[in-house]
Amino acid sequence: MPQPDAALEPIVGRYINIESLGRKYRIFYEESGEGIPLICLHTAGTDSRQFRHVLNDPEITSKCRVIAFDMPLHGRSNPPDNWWLEKYELTTKVYTNLIHDFWLALGVENPIVMGCSMGGAVTLQVAADYQEEITGIIGLESTAFAEGRDNNFLHHPAIHGGEL
C-alpha cells in the first residue's frame, strides 16, 4: 500500500559523456527547474548533493534551471578515461575548461555559475576566462586568494616534532 504522504522530488539525475582538453569524462549531474541556467559547483571532497535544497526550492526553481554536477573522482562522476596512464591533476585550467565544456555539452547559454569554497574560488577564473558567455557568478564561502593551508604551529618542536 502506497504511503499517503509520499512525494517525488523534482530533481532528475543523468550522466553525460564529454571531452575536455583531450580527455573523456563521464559526468553525473542533477537538475531541476526552468529558466536562467544556474550551474552549481560543489566544495572539494563533496558532490552535487550539497545543493539538494537549492534543487528542491520552488522559489528558486520557478526562475532558474538549477544544474549541479559531480567533479571527476567525486560523487557519481568517474575519473577521466585512462586516468592511471598519466598523472591526473585537477588544476584551475583543467577545472575551468571542464566546467565550460560541461555547460556547452548541455546546450546551456549564458549561465550563472555559483560555487562554494573551492568551487566559489574557481568562479572568479570562470568569469575571467568566459566573461562574454556567462550572466554572472556567485561565490559562496570563497576567496580570491588564501595563504597555504599549512598550519605552522604543528611544526613547533614541542608538538610531535612536526609529525602528524
Q: Residue spans of the language-model regions?
A:
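Flexible "cap/lid" loop of the alpha/beta hydrolase fold
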Residues: 124-129, 134-164
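Conserved HGGG/HGGXW glycine-rich cap/lid loop of the alpha/beta-hydrolase fold
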Residues: 21, 25-79
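Active-site loop/oxyanion-hole signature of alpha/beta-hydrolase fold enzymes
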Residues: 21-22, 68-114
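Structural signature of beta-strand start/N-cap positions in the alpha/beta core
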Residues: 37, 65, 109-112, 133-136
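Catalytic nucleophile serine of serine hydrolases
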Residues: 77, 117, 141
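Short, hydrophobic alpha-helix immediately C-terminal to the catalytic nucleophile
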Residues: 52, 100, 124-128
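An N-terminal hydrophobic leader/cap segment in hydrolases
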Residues: 1-17
